[in-house]
Regions:
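Aromatic- and carboxylate-enriched substrate-binding clefts and catalytic-loop regions
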Residues: 28, 43, 215-238
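Short secondary-structure boundary/capping segments
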Residues: 134-135, 203, 233-238
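Aromatic-lined carbohydrate-binding surfaces of glycoside hydrolases
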Residues: 183-193, 222-227, 231
Length: 238
């Protein structure tokens, strides 16, 4: 027979069930309301040979998903699959390219019962399926899958999505407060160094800054400013 037990506080609790293992997260409103529920059919997967791991949760029709760091397309992520890797995606399409330069495995969900956040503490390459996949043998679901490591996650709840931000910052730490001198504009490009009249292009850039009254604290030639054939390099060994 299925067994269950409850662990929680005055504002948040988790109901843990076995056969198979799954969890239901609830927050206190006027009564206890569910904000996240593991898929009842195989919520957790651990590949004994591949090392891959996965976590599947129930997707309700009115759930809306946000977060994941720098991603293309709308801020509302529902219905897409996102690859959590870092690439130099030069020339990417702002509406569809994935992955991009940086990501954060923190997913926020707006539910009918409040906001729910889940942060996966795993450094390997991973993927989020936010409703793009449909499987006849399971209820509608979302998934997180990682190539290696543990299924190790943190959860948080709030009345509104914006209230989740202070909570994740308490966990990961605040961004460093920049000094005033670091807030200026720094120009950067690879285009000028490719031009046959590179020196003229650089001086023209300075003239344009003056024309439009744009202050500029520094300028760099960016990555790839040396070349060998068709390839770019940060520097070239002699």
């Amino acid at each position: 027979d299925e067994k269950s037990f409850i662990v929680g506080t005055d504002s948040l609790r988790v109901i843990i069930r076995d056969c198979p293992l799954r969890m239901t997260w609830q927050r206190r409103a006027d009564d206890w309301v569910t904000v996240s529920e593991d898929r009842p059919t195989g919520a957790y997967e651990i590949g004994t040979h591949t090392g891959q791991v996965a976590h599947h949760r129930v997707r309700n029709i009115d759930d809306r998903y946000y977060g994941l760091g720098e991603k293309s397309g709308d801020l509302e992520r529902t219905g897409r699959i996102f690859d959590m890797r870092c690439l130099d995606a030069l020339g990417y399409d702002a509406g569809s390219t994935d992955p991009l330069y940086k990501h954060v495995p923190f997913l926020m969900t707006r539910t009918a019962n409040g906001a729910f956040g889940i942060f996966y503490d795993n450094l390997s390459a991973s993927r989020f399926n936010l409703g793009a996949e449909v499987d006849n043998y399971h209820r509608p679901f979302t998934s997180w899958q990682a190539d290696h490591g543990d299924i190790d996650y943190w959860v948080m709840t709030a009345d509104h999505l914006c209230d989740l931000t202070p909570q994740i910052l308490r966990l990961t730490g605040d961004p460093a407060f920049l000094p005033r001198w670091a807030l200026g504009y720094s120009g950067s490009t690879m285009h000028y160094t490719d031009a046959p009249d590179a020196s003229h292009q650089l001086l023209k850039f300075i003239d344009l800054l003056r024309e439009h009254a744009i202050p500029c604290d520094s300028f760099q030639l960016s990555s790839g400013y040396t070349t060998m054939g068709s390839r770019r390099y940060v520097f070239t060994w002699d």
